[in-house]
């Protein structure tokens, strides 16, 4: 469903209101403890944030992609780590099931994912394989009516939190890119093992894990889509992911600007608020301009996608510009705070830690170029 501008603004306001009420007041504490109450995701589902592009018959909101990324910006402005769990659940996991899943898989998984009962995770990256996704080594070997999965995945968002995993594995070692398949399966399988929860610079409100598949047996019916089409399934929505990261970056940068602007109005030097000093005012103006430019880039790319047009180049541009912009803006926000910006008493310290990853995941800045 493609919506009009007024509808998009209404969706943005729903997401913003939720974020300001349910996330912002608690984000610093959740960052400190590296834990988020599971019921938060149930609450997100109640307002339609966990299955935004999924058809209503499966419990989703049936909205367009632009609605999704606008909501993503709002959640990311409150906390980047929580926004990333929302992203993984919506796309690629739920979207992939809707696009290529069997009727049984849709019945088994989609309503649980959209309701917040279950959370999904995507298992593609491996310890030595990031941007070169076709070089993965996790194996799936057929054994009667089952597949046996062995291997290790790395940097898995919500790897410990999630209830269902979309796993990309090699089913035909001689098949090249056509020898890779996708599986969708619950994580309560005894062969699914969390090796480590990573200690991260930022995004501490979600768990990022290394996952091992120890002779993990899954029924043949857990294959997602056709055999040999796994890499295509994983990468088919890559542009969606990159536009989503651009929206996350804009959200983080916007939070940094808001914090810097507020501080600049309160902090006084030489008898007046520092916002009245041209050096600071110019910084804030530049920050606001860069944020709006990044927003227009991701909004344009999302609009192309909603119209069924090719958007790979525009998605890469949006992610590249927005992710690097977010670090610059967060850095300037710290500078405006002076020494206080280096302390975790002020939000810009956390924001800076959170935005740094946007230049890395969903394809590094170098890959976008």
Where are these regions (language model features)?
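Alpha-helical interface subdomain recognition
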Residues: 1-88, 100-105, 112-117, 132, ...
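Short Ser/Thr-interspersed hydrophobic loop/turn segments at strand-loop and sheet-helix junctions
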Residues: 48, 72-76, 169, 185-190, ...
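Short glycine/proline-enriched turns and hinge-like loops at secondary-structure junctions
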Residues: 63, 132-134, 158-163, 176-179, ...
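Flexible, glycine-rich active-site loops centered on histidine and acidic residues
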Residues: 94-100, 122, 134
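Short Gly/Pro-enriched turn/cap motifs at secondary-structure boundaries
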Residues: 113, 128-131, 155-158, 172-174, ...
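A short, Trp-centered hydrophobic/proline-enriched beta-strand micro-motif
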Residues: 116-124
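Flexible, small-/acidic-enriched active-site or ligand-binding loops
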Residues: 135, 188-219
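A short core secondary-structure module
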Residues: 146, 150-194
